[in-house]
Amino acid sequence: MARLALLSVSNKTGLIDLARRLVEEFEFDLISSGGTAQALKDAGLPVTKVADYTGSPEILGGRVKTLHPRIHGGILARRDVASDLTDLENNQIRPIDLVVVNLYPFESTIAKPGVTLAEAVEQIDIGGPAMLRASSKNFAHLTVLCDPAQYDEYLQELRQNNGVASLEFRQKAALKGFLHTASYDSAIASYLSGTQQHTLSGTELQSLRYGENPHQPAAWYQTGTTPTGWTAAEKLQGKELSYNNLVDLEAARRIIAEFTDTPAATIIKHTNPCGTALADTIVEAYQKAFNADATSAFGGIVALNRPIDAATASELTKTFLECVIAPDCDAEAQKILSKKSNVRVLTLADLSTGPKTLVKQIAGGFLVQAADDIAADTSQWQVVTERQPTPDELAELLFAWKVCKHVKSNAIVVTSDRTTLGVGAGQMNRIGSTKIALEQAGDKAKGAILASDGFFPFDDTVRTAAAAGISAIVQPGGSLRDQDSVKAANELGLLMVLTGVRHFLH
């Protein structure tokens, strides 16, 4: 008798090719439900609908399809237990040798803006997890596949082992099944419990050489089953990504995501921008960002919000860089970049979408916060000095504010012509960061903009900025001594804008 495969998937990637190989190369019979059965039928493949096999129609609008003894008996039967085989025979149940199942897209559903509770609940799979757990439990006697990435390996197993997957493969596949259901249930529990329960689940995507330092083991995990963010990026060339590369790439992505309307470039070192700029073309933006701090740019991470063209690629090859990320890279640019084969060049079409929540571990637990995704809204800004901003000054203030948001606190950023001139990051006092940023800017500080991620507890930052030639300041406000800083700004002829929003970054 031909072997029996049950196929019931939401993600139909690779489904038809797998099913065709099962039928034509290994003589499997196929049973399937709902949309999967229709897809197989449309492809011209012989398939029996689950409802026809069980003799029970799908009911409750499709909520009950595979929850039937003829399905679960065929999955859970032990082929080496006589009483199990007798039960199968008495109930006219065929043993199922392969279960291919993946689950309703619950996580992608709840990630959609405005999704309702009812919409989320409808995407809670019942039959899928039941089949997945049952077949994973009985791995000694059948194979379960829950990821299209497993299909080719499974077919190779059949070809190499006379049509039967090895026990080692079946056990590995079963583990993947249990991990899949555990992650799925955790996502549901986290969603329904709100802040009462938070579960972080991931599948190891890649073992990394080490973490921040060589003595720290590290690995890269993917959340969910669908590649998104960095797991969806395409690496065009270069060495394997390191832990520090990935951390810096994410910092670069967050900055570049602030700018969509104008070509933008940023260069990151240790998660802080050493140069960020806007320009009419992407090559000009990169040149401006590089020249903002050419010394620090050496060995940096570059992010661009426009595709890499030949001119930009030529500029990128003039110095040592760890990584370059952009939405795309044309063929001529790839050819030029290939001359620097160690540089990791990645493309990611969507650089704007990041995690909605951030997690940080502490002793005995972890902290969860919403990502700092609030968009800058100049209509809510308050001009608190006598001097009012010109349209160009307002645009420069906005640029400086967006960059400052992504600099480690205490953060001070000096900019001009939509280019960073100086970045003071991570100092224990604000005046210290101010002095660093102004020292980097040098004479270029005259007429420039200064942004601060936090309020000024004293007027010393204003006076130090004015002495260096700064013409305008943007900061959150909120200090008990705000009026001291405003008074100093008016005395010294500076423009000051309060945003009402703080952007601490630790």
Curated annotation (Swiss-Prot):
Residue ranges of domain MGS-like in the record: 1-146
Signal peptide region: none
Pathway involvement of the protein, from the record: Purine metabolism; IMP biosynthesis via de novo pathway; 5-formamido-1-(5-phospho-D-ribosyl)imidazole-4-carboxamide from 5-amino-1-(5-phospho-D-ribosyl)imidazole-4-carboxamide (10-formyl THF route): step 1/1; Purine metabolism; IMP biosynthesis via de novo pathway; IMP from 5-formamido-1-(5-phospho-D-ribosyl)imidazole-4-carboxamide: step 1/1
Entry EC number(s): 2.1.2.3, 3.5.4.10
One Pfam family from the record: MGS
InterPro entries named in the record: AICAR_Tfase_dup_dom_sf, Cytidine_deaminase-like, MGS-like_dom, MGS-like_dom_sf, PurH-like
Cross-referenced Gene3D superfamilies: 3.40.140.20, Methylglyoxal synthase-like domain (3.40.50.1380)
CDD domains per record: IMPCH
Catalytic activity: (6R)-10-formyltetrahydrofolate + 5-amino-1-(5-phospho-beta-D-ribosyl)imidazole-4-carboxamide = 5-formamido-1-(5-phospho-D-ribosyl)imidazole-4-carboxamide + (6S)-5,6,7,8-tetrahydrofolate; IMP + H2O = 5-formamido-1-(5-phospho-D-ribosyl)imidazole-4-carboxamide
Gene Ontology biological-process entries: 'de novo' IMP biosynthetic process
Top-level taxon of the source organism: Bacteria
HAMAP family: PurH
Description of its domains: The IMP cyclohydrolase activity resides in the N-terminal region.
Family: Belongs to the PurH family.
Protein's UniProt name: Bifunctional purine biosynthesis protein PurH
